[in-house]
Regions:
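Non-catalytic structural connector segments
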Residues: 2-5, 166-169, 173-181, 186, ...
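Extended substrate/RNA-proximal surfaces in nucleic-acid metabolism proteins
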Residues: 2-41, 47-216, 223-235, 256, ...
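Generic recognition of stable, solvent-exposed alpha-helical segments in well-folded globular domains
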Residues: 29, 48-51, 55, 112, ...
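Alpha-helix C-terminal capping segments
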Residues: 36, 62, 419-425, 442-451
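Conserved short loop/turn motifs at secondary-structure junctions
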Residues: 44-50, 213-220, 247, 405, ...
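Phosphate/diphosphate-binding loops
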Residues: 74-79, 85-87, 100-103, 240, ...
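Conserved phosphate/anionic-ligand binding catalytic regions in large, soluble enzymes, centered on
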Residues: 113, 240-249, 428-451
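A glycine-rich phosphate-binding loop feature that marks nucleotide/adenosyl-phosphate handling sites
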Residues: 245-253, 304-306, 316-333, 437-446, ...
Length: 474
């Protein structure tokens, strides 16, 4: 790798729009444009959301298979988090216009690193709260520190954009300098920057923490870039350059602006996102001509270095069916006289998996409470058992394919629904409506997952799930 090549280490897709309109890039469009700009790799770093990663993996694999992408193209999976000192500072002492949620970029080196990203992202969403209509999802430094110090070396971090902690304080210094302000205030801001940089070095290590420059033309970005060059030299850190792509190319800027203003017409977006597109090496050099060309070139080459540090891995895996801890139970074998006639009822009763047997126990209870009546005829009894047998057959065959018990899914859903209804959870919670196909499954009715007997309405079970196309909705 080298020459006129670069890796885009900071790029956004439309998945960044989960909380705030942000990017017009599709995963496929972003990758195609990166190739057109001679990129040797690309990082997906959406704003506190990892949901584009699987699509990116599958798209890259498909493009390589079809010969649309070089085999050595490097996909990097990352996250742009909102890194804060403490939850109390930003949530409990929030001040409109003053409280900051600094941006921070993290890239997974390997599968373990991606697991760490997922843990931190989940924690950020657990921390979520609203300021007006804006949902905040802060990542607390202590959580990053505690997690990564247990198993370091799996995540690369960068200082991110103008919205990052280091750049927020650099811009404060710029304002003080403009106004011939208090040198003690500048000293205070410099100390904040020092504390942030040393924290990053301590948590991520010098070799996995990079100073990020960006080729925007704003006064603030130019000032910060010049200072960031000095900071990198002062702490012995490597620099990279990123374009923080939120749209594909300059001709898409107007569309991106209209998209962002569609929800908030007063939001100023034009100058802020002026440079946030997929830029080639020549465009980067042209925009950063106020910095020595060798420094910019080295920063570009360091993006390729990051690519070399990233391992090839996938986050794909076979479906994992949720499984809850079961209470003590005893199967009554209510249907034992019919075991010979109904293969899958018998198989569930004899299963070595306690989830299978527990599901049958719940079916027994539901049958007794809901369907067993004094005037139940023999034909009606066998129609019910035949339906139960067919539905259990679907679950059994899928379980064999997955080597996991499908029964545990229904048992777990039942428990979740019971928790929602439980007075101990507040007593005022509602179970939301689903797509509807779950109502066609008699077992759901017997477990109280649904409240409609599908046999009364001739609802087919296969609309809900079939061994040829598993699909659970409840």
């Amino acid at each position: 790798m080298g020459g006129n090549a670069v890796i885009g280490c900071h790029c956004h897709t439309c998945k960044s729009n989960i909380r705030l309109l942000d990017s017009t890039n599709s995963v496929k469009g972003l990758l195609e444009t990166a190739l057109e700009m001679n990129y040797k790799g690309l990082a997906i770093t959406d704003h506190e959301v990892l949901s584009a990663h699987l699509e990116a993996i599958q798209t890259v694999r498909s493009m390589k298979k079809e010969g649309e992408m070089p085999q050595d193209f490097k996909l990097i999976l990352g996250n742009e988090a909102y890194l804060v000192d403490s939850l109390e500072e930003v949530r409990d002492n929030y001040q409109p216009g003053k409280t900051k949620f600094p941006h921070f970029l993290m890239l997974a080196v390997d599968e373990k690193g991606h697991e760490q990203l997922r843990i931190l992202s989940s924690k950020a969403w657990e921390n979520s709260f609203y300021t007006g209509t804006m949902e905040r999802v802060p990542t607390v430094k202590k959580d990053v520190e505690d997690l990564l110090k247990k198993d370091p070396g799996h995540i690369i971090a960068t200082t991110a954009c103008l919205g990052s902690e280091v750049n927020i304080y650099l811009q404060k210094i710029m304002e003080v300098e403009k106004n011939d302000g208090d040198p003690e205030l500048i000293k205070e801001y410099k100390l904040k920057i020092h504390q942030f940089i040393t924290w990053c070095i301590d948590v991520f290590g010098k070799d996995k923490f990079f100073i990020e420059l960006q080729p925007a033309l704003s006064e603030e970005q130019i000032y910060c870039n010049k200072k960031l060059v000095q900071i990198a030299d002062g702490y012995g850190l490597k620099r990279i350059v990123t374009t923080d792509a939120h749209y594909l190319r300059p001709e898409d800027r107007a569309i991106h602006q209209a998209f962002l203003n569609a929800k908030d017409g007063e939001r100023e977006v034009d100058s802020f996102y002026e440079a946030c597109f997929v830029q080639n090496v020549d465009e980067i050099h042209e925009r950063m001509n106020y910095i020595d060309k060798e420094i910019v070139e080295e920063a570009i080459q360091n993006t390729l270095l990051i690519g070399e540090m990233i391992e090839d891995y996938t986050i794909e895996h076979e479906p994992i069916i949720p499984k809850m801890e079961l209470p003590n139970f005893k199967l009554r074998h209510l249907f034992k006289p019919a075991y010979d006639k109904y293969e899958y009822i018998r198989k569930m009763s004899e299963s070595k998996d306690d989830q299978d047997r527990y599901l049958l126990k719940l079916i027994e209870d539901g049958f007794e409470n809901k369907l067993l009546k004094n005037d139940l005829t023999r034909d009606e009894f066998h129609k019910i058992l035949s339906r139960i047998n067919v539905e259990l057959g679907e679950l059994w065959e899928i379980s064999q394919k997955l080597n996991q018990s499908m029964a545990s899914y229904y048992v777990t859903v039942r428990e979740i629904i019971n928790i929602i209804w439980d007075d101990e959870c507040g007593g005022d919670s509602l179970v939301g409506a689903a797509r509807g196909s779950a109502a066609g499954f008699l077992i759901n009715y017997l477990l109280d997952n649904t409240q409609i007997n599908p046999m009364q309405y001739d609802l087919p079970h296969w609309r809900h799930i079939h061994k040829s196309r598993p699909d659970c909705q409840s």
